[in-house]
Amino acid sequence: MVLPLPHQRLGLDPVPEYDDLRKDGPVHEYDTEPGMDGRKQWLVTGYDEVREILADHARFSSMRPVDDEADRALLPGILQAYDPPDHTRLRRTVAPAYSARRMERLRPRIEEIVEDCLDGFESVGSPVDFVRHAAWPIPALIACEFLGVPRDDQAELSRMIRDSRESRLARQRTSSGLGVVNYTQRLAARKRRDPGEGMIGVIVREHGDELTDEELAGLAEGNLIMAAEQMAAQLAIAVLLLVTHPAQMALLRERPELVDGAAEEVIRHASIVEAPAPRVALAVLRVAGHDIRAGEVVTCSLLATNRARGERFDITRQNAGHLAFGHGIHHCVGAPLARLQLRVALPAVVRRFPALRLAVPEEDLRFKPGRPAPFAVEELPLEW
């Protein structure tokens, strides 16, 4: 279920509609769209109100109907599509794989992937599209490694993941998507017999008897595709922010110890997931002076909430707290991996390419709108 939000996001510029909305308060009613059964819809843009709603899973449901077979197969990997107790059970199986200890064990391999992919990016020659030659390969390979995909399979699977989301040919998107589904099903079956390393192995060893084969394969596919797609969007936007803010890029190159704050500022400022799954009120409740009744639909704008805390991109920001990964029980379980990718990749990019810059005027860049897929730049031509 996708709710069209009442604005058009154009690149990285502020969204003027949100400035106007904030002046009128944190909660707003907007017109019912076709397919919503006449239910009233609400848009929430206030930080405190968004936190309140996202934390209140007892009175707001995030479950949604799924009719498409392909989406149904993917569903176990989309934790925010579930309410407790199913959400609790599925998240408990996945969360240990994202522990701080496992992230640190993964760091050397991520560093290797980043350097190898930047070698490939550089070898193409200036100018080159950063999205195709770095922003997609890096997270796709990281996601494969994280899941426990054998090294010999990673390059081909990474290509299929990218083509399933990025190819301009519908036939190729479909065939690549089916290739990913078939591979993850075989991978899940293999991990049942021999868990080995990676997220799926961790799940099988610790919770394998709690999951059906379909759920295990769905967790594999969902974490693989969503991790790759969202981290690709985030990495490309991060580099775009740096090359369009050269003083900030120079500061990060001179002071790499600022990378943790830089990563958080990128995540806050870009807000590639504009809104989490819409919530449906389960009871009558009052939010910021508005009565929201049972059955009405509430969309929480993470973009509006995060940008309200500062429109300027500043990697030294001290108040970079944000809700880009959500809040409450549906806080993004993959946030540690997304942060680690940026903390490794950004210093490497600015160190290796100190003169990196756009190869086209910024106004010529094209963006994906961010609903339902993450907000992303389609191509990012760079030169040095």
Regions found by a protein language model. Give the residues of each.
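Cytochrome P450
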Residues: M1-W384
